[in-house]
Amino acid sequence: MTTREDGRADDELRTVKITRGFTSHPAGSVLVEFGNTRVMCTASVEEGVPRWRKGSGLGWLTAEYAMLPAATHTRSGRESVKGKVGGRTQEISRLIGRSLRACIDLAAIGENTIALDCDVLQADGGTRTAAVTGAYVALVDAVTYLRAADLLSDPQPISCGIAAVSVGVVDGRVRLDLPYEEDSRAEVDMNVVATDTGTLVEIQGTGEGATFPRSTLDKLLDSALAGCEQLFEIQRQALAEPYPGVLPEPKNPEPKKKFGA
């Protein structure tokens, strides 16, 4: 099998690392690394829901994505300074939110909001897929936090795992997990979000420099789903460790029974 510039096989992921408890304040905080792409994903629990959600008894999950100015080779100004959020930033923020809402029962968290913030520290391709994969782990930790605080009506509101990976056609070959060097010249570029139950959440795919047949689409999806299976295992290993911070006490603990009562 032909090797790539970084030495990987076509169907091989970059080295993926997930570090929980990366920062101490949010309920969930993760550093996810796909090779040289590094994204900090946090999950914060906030009381209340958006105005249009009030009175429904349902919670909400929202996401924001951003890149640090020096995340790429050429510094890009902060969008907050420019006073306008770019279209790409909005698109990726919505993708992350949609992807993670697919795995959680929002009725179980009551009228509370889980806010996911994904900040790219260093970009080398696949930032949105790394963000989705890391945000899932941060979300699981946030749910653990809510459970400890006795704020869940269902102790297991997460129904499945969520991971995402990029895949594309480069030099006429289907390749998994594209770094920037490949992504920038791919003939076909695709991002796939999947569940660990074998279903798909979202597919974003375009022919950048060429059209492609249905048979290539099938190969792209097969490669992406195989990659996601590996990511699910990496997530499970990361989550097998204890919660990395201090869990809250229940807000309304049951009164202790008197001895002999």
Swiss-Prot record:
InterPro entries given in the database record: ExoRNase_PH_dom1, ExoRNase_PH_dom2, ExoRNase_PH_dom2_sf, PNPase/RNase_PH_dom_sf, Ribosomal_Su5_D2-typ_SF, RNase_PH, RNase_PH_bac-type, RNase_PH_CS
Catalytic activity line of the entry: tRNA(n+1) + phosphate = tRNA(n) + a ribonucleoside 5'-diphosphate
Basic and acidic residues bias spans: 251-261
Any GO molecular function: tRNA binding
Top EC category: transferase
EC number of this enzyme: 2.7.7.56
PANTHER family xrefs: EXOSOME COMPLEX COMPONENT, EXOSOME COMPLEX COMPONENT RRP41
Protein task: Phosphorolytic 3'-5' exoribonuclease that plays an important role in tRNA 3'-end maturation. Removes nucleotide residues following the 3'-CCA terminus of tRNAs; can also add nucleotides to the ends of RNA molecules by using nucleoside diphosphates as substrates, but this may not be physiologically important. Probably plays a role in initiation of 16S rRNA degradation (leading to ribosome degradation) during starvation.
Protein name, UniProt field: Ribonuclease PH
Gene: rph
